[in-house]
Amino acid sequence: MLGSSGRRLLTTVLQAQRWPFQPSRNMRLVQFQAPHLAGPHLGLESGNGGGVIDLNAFEPTLPKTMVEFLEQGEATLSVVRRALATQLPVLPRSEVTFLAPVTRPDKVVCVGMNYADHCREQNVPVPKEPIIFSKFASAIVGPYDNIILPPESQEVDWEVELAVVIGKRGKYIKATDAMAHVAGFTVAHDVSARDWQMGRNGKQWLLGKTFDTFCPLGPALVTKDSVADPHNLKICCRVNGEVMQSSNTNQMVFKTEELITWVSQFVTLYPGDIILTGTPPGVGVFRKPPVFLKKGDEVQCEIEELGVIINKVV
């Protein structure tokens, strides 16, 4: 992965660039590091391309990880609202290293075949119920970290996805109550080794989905009240600047509420848990001929209102 100086340089470059989709300027929670700080801190991104407010400096009693922050519920969110309303020192973007907004969640739940247009590109019917698989939390990396090509795979592919971050514990959650259990949303890259997903390991998807670095997340956890409609967002993936995936989250077969209801039948959802909600068409494996990632490629995954993550393949 990029070292701290390399990631800080990348965030400086990003600050000078303009992206097609406008990120939300409201409550954008981040985990970050800086040379003068001991360990990760929680922060508040001050708008598109802006610096970071150190929430732990504003309120030293706040936890320093997102999972612990979410576990404390409304009490911690009220601190963030106070921080938003206060003129606070802002760390320049060039001085911070962005981490994944959530690290070490209890679980990462993934959904397959959940875009109608993705089903059409494969000429298969839309599923009648959600197709669930998982990634291990060890696959998570930050929004500007490297994706490491494993020597075990020759068919590593891209998938941009909307990720839902759970904010409240629940089991057997009703669809009408589901959004009360959501903290917010972020951008995910469901990197996939197709040879392991589709041809090996008994065609069980897990190993092909969970190599180290196969789940970049970020750049921020955008709280649900800062997103106008999570099911009407432009979603895009570019490889080396070329648009490979371009769709809208309105193509999702099962929306956030349905997914939470379905998954919570089987497992208890905890604060910090992540649900990757599926990918639109345009992945490499279904191109003719198939196209896969190679060393030196740069992948940009972007979702309207949420932002962009940029990961180099090494």
From Swiss-Prot:
SS bond partners: none
GO molecular function, one term: metal ion binding
Enzyme class label: isomerase
InterPro entries hit by this protein: FAH, Fumarylacetoacetase-like_C, Fumarylacetoacetase_C_sf
GO biological process: oxaloacetate metabolic process
Cofactor comment: Requires a divalent metal cation for activity.
Residues annotated to bind Mg(2+): 159, 161, 190
Enzyme Commission code(s) on record: 5.3.2.2
Residue range of the transit peptide in the UniProt record, numbered on this chain: 1-84
Gene3D superfamilies (UniProt xref): Fumarylacetoacetase-like, C-terminal domain (3.90.850.10)
Location(s) in or outside the cell: Mitochondrion
Predominant localisation class: mitochondrion
Catalysed conversion reaction: oxaloacetate = enol-oxaloacetate
Keyword line: Isomerase, Magnesium, Metal-binding, Mitochondrion, Transit peptide
Cited function: Tautomerase that converts enol-oxaloacetate, a strong inhibitor of succinate dehydrogenase, to the physiological keto form of oxaloacetate. It is thereby required to maximize aerobic respiration efficiency by preventing succinate dehydrogenase inhibition.
Family (UniProt): Belongs to the FAH family.
PANTHER family named in the record: FUMARYLACETOACETATE HYDROLASE DOMAIN-CONTAINING PROTEIN 2A (PTHR42796:SF4), FUMARYLACETOACETATE HYDROLASE DOMAIN-CONTAINING PROTEIN 2A-RELATED (PTHR42796)
Full protein name: Oxaloacetate tautomerase FAHD2A, mitochondrial
Organism: Bos taurus (Bovine)
Gene name per UniProt: FAHD2A
